Structure formats: structure tokens, C-alpha cells
């Protein structure tokens, strides 16, 4: 008998340089559950060679609510990863 591994699939929205590095403005990623934003960043780095440039603690939001790297991910979440913003 084989054990099934629960997964969580999320939609990742990428902006500015992050989208340029990965070559798309959104991707779907499946992760072993339980998963956090930190796990998501690690998975992106494994799946996309240029994503190794992503910071370990990117500005992020889950379903349009500010999140941290320790925030848990749930099935169907929409996770936005935003590069640092500058203004004047």
C-alpha cells in the first residue's frame, strides 16, 4: 500500500523583474502540504532557473492580504510576489 502525499496548488502572480526572470506573469505551483510562502519560493527556485534571483523573503500577499514567509498556503490561494518598491 502506498501512502498518498497531500498537496496544495496555488496560483502565483509575479510582477516586474520577478515576471521577467520567470518569463511569465503567473504560474500554478503544487507543493506538499502543509506549505508556506517560504516553501513556495524554494519550489519556484527549483522549477525555474532564473528564479534563483528571488529573495528569500519577498514582499508577498495571499488573496490580496499581506503575508510573511511563514504564512500558510491553502488550496486555491492566489499568492502575489512583489519586488521592492521605490518612489520619490
For each feature predicted by the language model, list its residue ranges.
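Ubiquitin-like/PB1-type beta-grasp interaction modules and other compact soluble beta-rich domains
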Residues: 1-87
Amino acid at each position: 500500500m502506498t501512502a498518498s502525499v497531500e498537496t496544495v496548488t496555488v496560483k502565483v502572480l509575479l510582477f516586474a523583474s520577478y515576471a521577467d526572470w520567470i518569463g511569465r506573469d503567473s504560474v500554478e505551483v503544487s507543493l506538499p502540504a502543509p506549505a508556506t510562502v517560504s516553501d513556495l519560493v524554494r519550489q519556484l527556485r527549483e522549477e525555474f532557473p532564473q528564479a534563483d534571483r528571488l529573495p528569500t523573503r519577498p514582499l508577498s500577499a495571499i488573496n490580496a492580504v499581506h503575508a510573511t514567509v511563514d504564512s500558510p498556503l491553502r488550496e486555491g490561494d492566489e499568492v502575489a510576489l512583489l519586488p521592492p518598491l521605490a518612489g520619490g
